[in-house]
Protein backbone atom coordinates (compact mmCIF):
# COMPACT_ATOMS: atom_id res chain seq x y z
CA UNK A 1 0.00 0.00 0.00
CA UNK A 2 1.36 3.38 -0.97
CA UNK A 3 0.64 6.71 0.71
CA UNK A 4 1.76 9.88 -1.04
CA UNK A 5 3.76 12.34 1.04
CA UNK A 6 4.77 15.92 0.30
CA UNK A 7 7.23 18.20 2.08
CA UNK A 8 5.56 21.54 2.73
CA UNK A 9 8.90 22.96 3.86
CA UNK A 10 12.40 21.97 2.66
CA UNK A 11 13.54 21.13 6.21
CA UNK A 12 10.60 18.83 6.97
CA UNK A 13 11.59 15.26 7.81
CA UNK A 14 9.84 12.33 6.15
CA UNK A 15 8.38 10.01 8.84
CA UNK A 16 10.09 6.64 9.23
CA UNK A 17 9.51 3.43 11.13
CA UNK A 18 12.23 2.78 13.69
CA UNK A 19 11.96 -1.02 13.34
CA UNK A 20 10.74 -3.32 10.58
CA UNK A 21 7.53 -4.29 12.41
CA UNK A 22 6.75 -0.96 14.09
CA UNK A 23 3.12 0.09 13.64
CA UNK A 24 3.84 3.80 13.53
CA UNK A 25 5.97 6.19 11.52
CA UNK A 26 7.67 8.75 13.78
CA UNK A 27 6.65 12.37 13.24
CA UNK A 28 9.33 15.04 13.67
CA UNK A 29 9.08 18.66 14.77
CA UNK A 30 9.57 21.26 12.05
CA UNK A 31 8.38 24.06 14.30
CA UNK A 32 5.86 24.62 17.07
CA UNK A 33 3.53 27.43 18.07
CA UNK A 34 1.10 28.36 20.80
CA UNK A 35 -2.54 27.73 19.80
CA UNK A 36 -3.22 31.40 19.08
CA UNK A 37 -0.42 31.41 16.47
CA UNK A 38 -1.54 28.27 14.62
CA UNK A 39 -2.12 30.13 11.35
CA UNK A 40 1.36 31.72 11.29
CA UNK A 41 3.65 30.71 8.41
CA UNK A 42 6.44 28.26 9.19
CA UNK A 43 9.23 29.80 11.29
CA UNK A 44 12.52 29.70 9.39
CA UNK A 45 14.70 30.04 12.48
CA UNK A 46 12.84 27.76 14.90
CA UNK A 47 15.09 25.82 17.28
CA UNK A 48 12.91 24.97 20.32
CA UNK A 49 9.81 25.86 22.31
CA UNK A 50 9.38 25.45 26.05
CA UNK A 51 6.12 23.82 27.10
CA UNK A 52 5.18 24.46 30.72
CA UNK A 53 3.01 22.21 32.92
CA UNK A 54 -0.60 22.42 31.78
CA UNK A 55 0.34 24.22 28.54
CA UNK A 56 -0.44 22.99 25.05
CA UNK A 57 1.29 23.67 21.74
CA UNK A 58 0.79 22.85 18.10
CA UNK A 59 3.74 21.04 16.54
CA UNK A 60 3.89 21.45 12.79
CA UNK A 61 5.61 18.63 10.91
CA UNK A 62 5.88 20.32 7.53
CA UNK A 63 4.49 17.28 5.75
CA UNK A 64 1.19 16.49 4.06
CA UNK A 65 -0.09 13.05 3.10
CA UNK A 66 -2.63 11.70 0.65
CA UNK A 67 -4.21 8.31 1.22
CA UNK A 68 -6.70 6.30 -0.72
CA UNK A 69 -10.38 6.10 0.13
CA UNK A 70 -11.06 3.71 2.99
CA UNK A 71 -8.06 4.84 5.04
CA UNK A 72 -7.26 7.28 7.81
CA UNK A 73 -4.03 8.15 9.57
CA UNK A 74 -4.01 8.37 13.35
CA UNK A 75 -1.57 10.65 15.17
CA UNK A 76 -0.68 8.87 18.41
CA UNK A 77 1.54 9.70 21.39
CA UNK A 78 5.01 8.27 21.93
CA UNK A 79 5.18 6.28 25.15
CA UNK A 80 8.65 7.48 26.18
CA UNK A 81 7.62 11.15 26.17
CA UNK A 82 4.53 10.33 28.21
CA UNK A 83 6.38 8.20 30.77
CA UNK A 84 9.47 10.38 31.22
CA UNK A 85 8.03 13.87 30.81
CA UNK A 86 4.22 13.73 30.96
CA UNK A 87 4.02 14.95 27.35
CA UNK A 88 1.13 13.46 25.39
CA UNK A 89 -1.40 14.32 22.71
CA UNK A 90 -4.42 16.33 23.74
CA UNK A 91 -6.67 14.73 21.11
CA UNK A 92 -5.42 11.19 21.05
CA UNK A 93 -5.57 9.75 18.57
CA UNK A 94 -5.68 12.68 16.22
CA UNK A 95 -7.41 11.83 12.96
CA UNK A 96 -6.05 12.67 9.52
CA UNK A 97 -8.90 12.10 7.05
CA UNK A 98 -8.22 10.73 3.57
CA UNK A 99 -9.28 14.01 1.97
CA UNK A 100 -7.11 16.28 4.18
CA UNK A 101 -3.92 17.43 2.48
CA UNK A 102 -2.60 20.10 4.86
CA UNK A 103 0.18 20.00 7.46
CA UNK A 104 -0.01 16.95 9.73
CA UNK A 105 -0.12 18.77 13.05
CA UNK A 106 0.40 17.38 16.54
CA UNK A 107 -1.31 18.95 19.57
CA UNK A 108 0.95 18.32 22.58
CA UNK A 109 0.10 18.95 26.22
CA UNK A 110 2.42 18.87 29.22
CA UNK A 111 0.73 16.88 31.99
CA UNK A 112 3.97 16.68 33.96
CA UNK A 113 5.19 18.94 36.76
CA UNK A 114 8.25 20.41 34.96
CA UNK A 115 8.73 22.36 31.76
CA UNK A 116 9.99 20.47 28.71
CA UNK A 117 11.82 21.86 25.69
CA UNK A 118 10.50 20.59 22.35
CA UNK A 119 13.25 20.94 19.75
CA UNK A 120 13.35 20.96 15.99
CA UNK A 121 13.62 17.40 14.59
CA UNK A 122 12.46 15.78 17.87
CA UNK A 123 10.25 12.73 17.38
CA UNK A 124 7.05 13.68 19.22
CA UNK A 125 4.30 11.42 17.85
CA UNK A 126 3.68 8.53 15.53
CA UNK A 127 1.50 8.15 12.46
CA UNK A 128 -0.47 4.89 12.19
CA UNK A 129 -2.63 4.01 9.18
CA UNK A 130 -6.00 2.33 9.71
CA UNK A 131 -8.93 1.20 7.55
CA UNK A 132 -12.14 3.22 7.68
CA UNK A 133 -15.61 2.04 6.72
CA UNK A 134 -17.08 4.87 4.66
CA UNK A 135 -20.12 2.80 3.72
CA UNK A 136 -21.57 3.06 7.26
CA UNK A 137 -24.95 4.80 7.38
CA UNK A 138 -26.71 5.94 10.55
CA UNK A 139 -30.36 4.96 10.87
CA UNK A 140 -32.48 6.63 13.53
CA UNK A 141 -34.73 4.34 15.60
CA UNK A 142 -37.21 4.84 18.43
CA UNK A 143 -35.66 1.93 20.38
CA UNK A 144 -32.66 -0.39 20.29
CA UNK A 145 -32.49 -4.16 20.82
CA UNK A 146 -32.00 -5.36 24.40
CA UNK A 147 -28.44 -6.45 25.29
CA UNK A 148 -26.86 -8.00 28.37
CA UNK A 149 -25.16 -4.72 29.27
CA UNK A 150 -27.97 -2.38 28.29
CA UNK A 151 -27.27 1.28 29.04
CA UNK A 152 -24.70 0.60 31.80
CA UNK A 153 -22.00 3.23 31.30
CA UNK A 154 -18.56 4.05 32.67
CA UNK A 155 -17.37 1.56 35.28
CA UNK A 156 -20.51 -0.55 34.91
CA UNK A 157 -18.62 -3.79 34.28
CA UNK A 158 -16.32 -3.30 37.29
CA UNK A 159 -12.78 -2.20 37.97
CA UNK A 160 -11.09 -5.36 39.24
CA UNK A 161 -11.86 -8.92 40.26
CA UNK A 162 -11.03 -8.55 43.97
CA UNK A 163 -13.94 -8.75 46.46
Curated annotation (Swiss-Prot):
Broad class of enzyme this protein falls into: hydrolase
EC assignment: 3.6.1.23
Q: Where is the composition biased (Basic and acidic residues)?
A: 140-151
Stretches the record annotates as Disordered = 140-163
Catalytic reaction list? dUTP + H2O = dUMP + diphosphate + H(+)
Q: In which pathway does it act?
A: Pyrimidine metabolism; dUMP biosynthesis; dUMP from dCTP (dUTP route): step 2/2
Which cofactors? Mg(2+)
Query: Which InterPro entries does this UniProt record tie to the protein?
Result: dUTPase, dUTPase-like, dUTPase-like_sf, dUTPase_trimeric
- Name the source's superkingdom: Bacteria
Which of UniProt's keywords are assigned here? Hydrolase, Magnesium, Metal-binding, Nucleotide metabolism
Q: Which GO terms describe its molecular function?
A: dUTP diphosphatase activity; magnesium ion binding
Q: For substrate, which residues are the binding ones? A: 78-80, 91, 95-97
Its GO biological process annotations read: dUMP biosynthetic process; dUTP catabolic process
Q: Which PANTHER family match?
A: DEOXYURIDINE 5'-TRIPHOSPHATE NUCLEOTIDOHYDROLASE (PTHR11241:SF0)
> Which family does the record assign?
Belongs to the dUTPase family.
Task: Describe the task this protein carries out.
Answer: This enzyme is involved in nucleotide metabolism: it produces dUMP, the immediate precursor of thymidine nucleotides and it decreases the intracellular concentration of dUTP so that uracil cannot be incorporated into DNA.
Spell out the HAMAP family in the cross-references. Answer: dUTPase_bact
What is the name attached to this protein's record? Answer: Deoxyuridine 5'-triphosphate nucleotidohydrolase
Amino acid sequence: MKVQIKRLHPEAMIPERQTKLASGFDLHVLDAVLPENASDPYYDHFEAIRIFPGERILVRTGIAIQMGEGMEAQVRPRSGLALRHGITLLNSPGTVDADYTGDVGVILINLGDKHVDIRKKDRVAQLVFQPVFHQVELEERESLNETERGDGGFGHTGVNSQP
